[in-house]
Structure formats: C-alpha cells, structure tokens
C-alpha cells in the first residue's frame, strides 16, 4: 500500500470489482451521530500530487498535472469503475503546471491555465480519447491566471474567478465548435480564487473561496440559459433554527465538491488550518446538512469526481505531505468508529 510522500517543495502560491476498504481515522471532525462513511478506494497510480486538474468523459475520469513532492508535473492518467487500476495516457502537451483548470464537453477533455513556476498561463489544450492526443486550442479569453473554477453546461465550457495577482470574478464561455471564448456575466459577490464548483439541476454553483485574507461564505448559482447569477443562502447562522448553527465551518478555500443523487458534497480545503468537515447541499431547500468529516488526513488542493453516481476524493497535500490515496464517500452509511489504517 502506498503512503503519503513527504512534501518538500514550497510553492509560490474500481471496481472490477473495485476495491473498497473502510477508512480509518477514528472520530473524524463532526462525526458524532452523523451519517456518511469514507472508504479507501484504489490508490492513484501516478505520483502523489496536489493542485492537479480533472475532467470526466463517458464514465472515465482523467487526472493530470499538479505539484508533486519535488516538482511540477505534466503526466495524465485515466480510471473507470470497470478496472481496478489507473492507466497512464499521453502526457499533457502544455508542459508542467499546477493550479490549472479542466472540463469536458462533447466527448473531449480540456485542460489549461495555471502556473509553471515562472509564469501564469492561459493556454488551453483539447484531449481526444480516440487518438490519445492533445491539440492546442485558442487561448483562454481572460487574463492568465491560477486557481479558477471550470465547469460545463449545455455543451459549452466555462472558466470563472481566479487570481492573476488580483482576485477575479469574470466568467468566460468556451464554444468548442467555434474554438472561441465569449465573456459572460461575472460571478456575484466578492472577487475570489480557490473556490469550488458543482453542477445540480443543470446549473453551476460556486461556493466559498479566498479573497483578501479570508474565506468567503457565499453561494452563487449560474443559469447558463439566461446568463444570470443568483445568490443563495449565506453560509452563516442567520436563523433561529438549528440547521445553520454550524454553517461557519463550511467556509473555506481549496476544497473539493462532488454530486450524487441530486445533492452536492463539499469537503477538505483550508481555513486557517486544514478542514475535514463535510457538508451536503440540497438545492431544493437551499440548505446544508453536516455529514461525517473526511476520514483521511486533512488536506487542501485535492480533487473530486463522480462516476456512475459514486463520489470520490483523491490526492491533495497537508503542510508536510502530498497524497496519492483515493476515498469514496458513502452518504447513507453510518461512520464506522472502529475503522483503522
């Protein structure tokens, strides 16, 4: 079994059947009587890393680039639930980088932006699973940046927020058919970097992030059909009811988000210290419910993905380590307080 790799670099900025082992850390944050269990899945077969990118095409997830233990990376890997291992694919042709973006549209994957150790980047590359090759596409329409969010809606890609030595809130749409970028309505609320994004009900939700020394506590939802943003309930205690008493623990940056069963989950990240609290969001009620905290080592700069309605969290870093482990979240299973690893 692989273990965490000592993190030496200071940065400027599954089934076949799939192996699932109960995760291990006793009494994760917010466990108590909360529901949800974290199980160790198949380890990522590439080098341990953080600040990588991911996209999903036809029930296959792709993961690449990022910061390893001693250097930035440009390798790429794929995984599907009908195999029990990761397969290396063609290296990312844009070169080494961390803190970039990834999304998938119409059976193709897109990756770009980020930081190569010297320069903020704005190049964008398209991956074809059929040819296992990368092709340079039109540069991103906004400024070169790091720590943006990316998502896909209605056969278009979107890149929003980020940092170019200033915090940003612009929002750009990519049309793969025309290979063109068009600026759209900017994200409401503060300019930010290191936010998280998830898709529910064919709308994009941008949550939290970092701006001017603090974690943000807002949730903004984007409707691509109308090109409008709506502010949802803030992540703070604003009612006399008990459901939002602990909402302040949701605010963080460099967290991950994933969806299952028409709900979203937010976990990991940081807010002064590493954050393992896990929260479930129900868009029909605009409410968050705390679930069992992430049971692996608390981390930031991780990735998350959903395959066949199953949610996974992988990679990331702590203050001293980078990780290659993968966890599956089982939302309706009680936490096993006797898990060990």
Predicted regions located by residue number:
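Sec-dependent bacterial lipoprotein signal peptides
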Residues: 1-22
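Kelch-like beta-propeller repeat domains
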Residues: 24-341
């Amino acid at each position: 079994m692989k273990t965490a790799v000592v993190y030496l670099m200071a940065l400027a900025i599954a089934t076949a059947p799939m192996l699932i082992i109960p995760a291990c850390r006793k009494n994760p944050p917010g466990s108590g009587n909360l529901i949800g269990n974290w199980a160790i899945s198949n380890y990522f077969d590439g080098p341990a890393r953080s600040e990588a990118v991911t996209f999903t095409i036809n029930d296959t997830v792709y993961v690449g680039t990022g910061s390893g233990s001693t250097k930035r990376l440009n390798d790429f890997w794929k995984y599907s639930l009908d195999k029990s291992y990761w397969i290396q694919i063609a290296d990312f042709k844009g070169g080494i980088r961390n803190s970039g973006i990834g999304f998938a549209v119409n059976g193709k994957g897109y990756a770009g932006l980020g930081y190569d150790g010297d320069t903020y980047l704005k190049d964008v590359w398209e991956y074809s699973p059929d040819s296992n090759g990368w092709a340079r596409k039109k540069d991103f329409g906004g400024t070169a940046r790091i720590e943006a969010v990316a998502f896909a809606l209605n056969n278009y890609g979107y890149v929003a927020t980020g940092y170019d030595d200033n915090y940003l809130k612009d929002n750009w749409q990519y049309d793969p058919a025309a290979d063109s970028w068009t600026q759209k309505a900017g994200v409401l609320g503060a300019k930010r970097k290191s936010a998280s994004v998830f898709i529910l009900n064919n709308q994009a939700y941008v949550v939290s992030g970092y701006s001017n020394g603090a974690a943000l506590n807002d949730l903004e939802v984007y409707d691509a059909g109308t090109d409008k943003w709506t502010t949802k309930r803030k992540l703070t205690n604003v009612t006399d009811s008990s459901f939002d008493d602990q909402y302040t623990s949701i605010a963080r940056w460099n967290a991950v988000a994933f969806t299952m069963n028409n709900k979203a989950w937010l976990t990991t990240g940081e807010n002064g210290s590493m954050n393992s609290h896990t929260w479930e969001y129900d868009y029909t009620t605009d409410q968050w419910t705390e679930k069992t905290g992430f049971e692996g080592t608390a981390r930031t700069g991780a990735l998350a993905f959903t395959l066949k309605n199953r949610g996974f969290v992988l990679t990331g870093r702590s203050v001293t380590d980078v990780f290659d482990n993968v966890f599956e979240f089982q939302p309706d299973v009680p936490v096993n307080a006797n898990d060990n690893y």
